[in-house]
Structure formats: C-alpha cells, structure tokens
C-alpha cells in the first residue's frame, strides 16, 4: 500500500478487542484502576453510529456538531458525507447579532432560536449557503464561502437565524441525496445540534425523513463505552448492546404542509449553489490582490 511494507502495518482486529490493561503510570495519572482492560475502540463515525444504534437496523445517522456528517445504509461498504459548517454557523450568527454573552452562552442560543421559531418557513425569502469554512460535501471545495441571498431591509436577526437553520438543512439534504442509493425512512439525530427542537423539526420538514432522538446525544462516547462492554463480555455483541443501551426519547415526523413548501424552495437552493460556485475564490482573491485604501 503506497510503498509501505505490510509488516510495518498493525494487525487488524475488531474494535472491541482487549489489547491490554491500564498501566501503573496511567493509573497514577488518571485515577483509573491499574489493570483495567483497554479495548481498541473506534473512530468517531464508527462509535457515533453505534451509540446512535444506527448500524445494524437500516437507519441513517446524522451528527450535528461544529460540522456535521451523515452515514446511510447502502449496498456499498460505507456511504458517508460531511459538511464543514453546521453548528459553527449557528454559533457564528449568534455572535454576529450580539447574543454571545460569554457568562451565559446558552441564553444567547435560546433567545435567537425562540425568535427564529416565530419566523414562518422560508425566512422571508432569505436563502443561506452555509459554507463558512470551505466545504467538504457533496463536492469538496476549500474556496467555498457563505452566502445570504435575498437580503432586504425587512430582514432582522430572527430571519437571518431561520435562514441559517434552513440553509444547513437544505445542504444536509443535498448530501443525503448524493450518498443514498435507496429511500431513507428514518434517521437518528445526535450531537449538540440535536438539542434544538426547532432545528430538529426543520431538518425533518426539509428532508421528509422521520427523526429519532436518543436520550444520550453524545453518541460517540456512548459507542466507545459499548465497545468496551462488548470487549470485557458484558454484552454478547455490539448490536445487542446498542439495542439494550440506546433509548429513543423522541420520534419527530415531518409535517406534510411544511415539507411540501420546502420541496418548492429546495430547487432554488440547488440552483443558487450552482450559480455561485464559479465565483468561489474569484471575488475574495481579487479583493486580497488589490491594495486596500487606508481606513
């Protein structure tokens, strides 16, 4: 493989394999008991899908954190797509409109989301392309930038926030459609973005997919714990462990009228993506090339 001798590569083992125990030095540093079994574990997507119980039962999984990714059932080995900016976009707009009080960070989000919820779907004709840190999918583009389209004097921070939530949902839909080879009936939603009831509903309405919300939203950590439990024999298999441990606390259905409305907007979102894409890297580059006048 790319010139690396096979003997230099590690032996491939199941993620739940016990590979040793906590050393004395590690026990002193962490407070863990010396000899506690250590399992291999897995990467973030593997552990998150397991902690969301979306691996062996045909469900898709959507993780929303600073960025977002989704994995779907597929005849291919691994169908996965990611976007660079999702939770970060909400954090950014909260800061831009002056609601990011460091002493109470949660209050700013709550206030802005409450205001956005009072805005009807469509954000007053405002579309948002959420490429604030380049883009990973469906088409990777390091030069991609964010866009508000349709901005008028009639728009305020509530409309801006609603457009951000909807724009991220539209983009996630485009990724799902790009990697799916069969209809998706339900999807488990995890990560910090799943805390917002408004965002959960917008995603369901935009995608037309039933969302399942588990009790533990930090599914990656739970998945790692499940692997440890399987490794030491507490559970007979990963799937049986996930079936027992993961508890779904909400099933959120898409609302038919709103889904139909978003279906009308979605083609305009895709059209805007296509029209703006050739400009990525051009206008900002020109602005950097020219010597800026003094302020």
Model-derived regions, located:
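Active-site core segments that coordinate phosphate-bearing ligands/cofactors
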Residues: 1-3, 13, 17-190, 194-295
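Conserved acidic, metal-coordinating active-site core of Asp-based
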Residues: 6-9
């Amino acid at each position: 493989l790319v010139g690396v001798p096979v003997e230099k590569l590690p032996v491939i083992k199941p993620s739940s394999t016990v590979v040793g125990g906590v050393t004395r030095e590690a026990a002193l540093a962490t407070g863990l008991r010396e000899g506690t079994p250590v399992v291999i574990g897995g990467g973030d997507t593997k552990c998150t899908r397991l902690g969301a119980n979306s691996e062996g039962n045909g469900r898709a999984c959507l993780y929303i954190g600073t960025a977002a990714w989704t994995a779907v059932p597929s005849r291919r080995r691994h169908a996965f797509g990611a976007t660079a900016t999702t939770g970060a976009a909400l954090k950014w707009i909260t800061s831009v409109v002056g609601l990011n009080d460091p002493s109470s960070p949660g209050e700013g989000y709550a206030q802005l989301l409450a205001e956005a919820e009072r805005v009807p779907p469509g954000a007053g004709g405002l579309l948002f392309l959420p490429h604030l840190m380049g883009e990973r999918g469906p088409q990777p583009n390091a030069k991609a930038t964010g866009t508000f389209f349709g901005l008028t004097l009639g728009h305020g921070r509530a409309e801006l926030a609603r457009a951000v939530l909807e724009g991220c949902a539209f983009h996630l839909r485009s990724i799902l459609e790009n990697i799916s080879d069969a209809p998706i009936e339900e999807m488990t939603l995890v990560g910090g973005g799943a805390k917002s009831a408004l965002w959960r509903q917008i995603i369901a309405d935009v995608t037309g997919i039933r969302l399942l919300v588990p009790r533990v939203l930090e599914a990656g950590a739970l998945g790692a714990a499940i692997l440890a439990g399987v490794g030491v024999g507490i559970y007979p298999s990963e799937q049986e462990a996930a079936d027992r441990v993961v508890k779904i606390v909400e099933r959120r259905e898409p609302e038919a009228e709103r889904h139909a409305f978003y279906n009308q907007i979605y083609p305009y979102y895709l059209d805007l993506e296509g029209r703006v894409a050739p400009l990525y890297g051009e206008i900002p580059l020109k602005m950097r090339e020219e010597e800026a006048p003094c302020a």
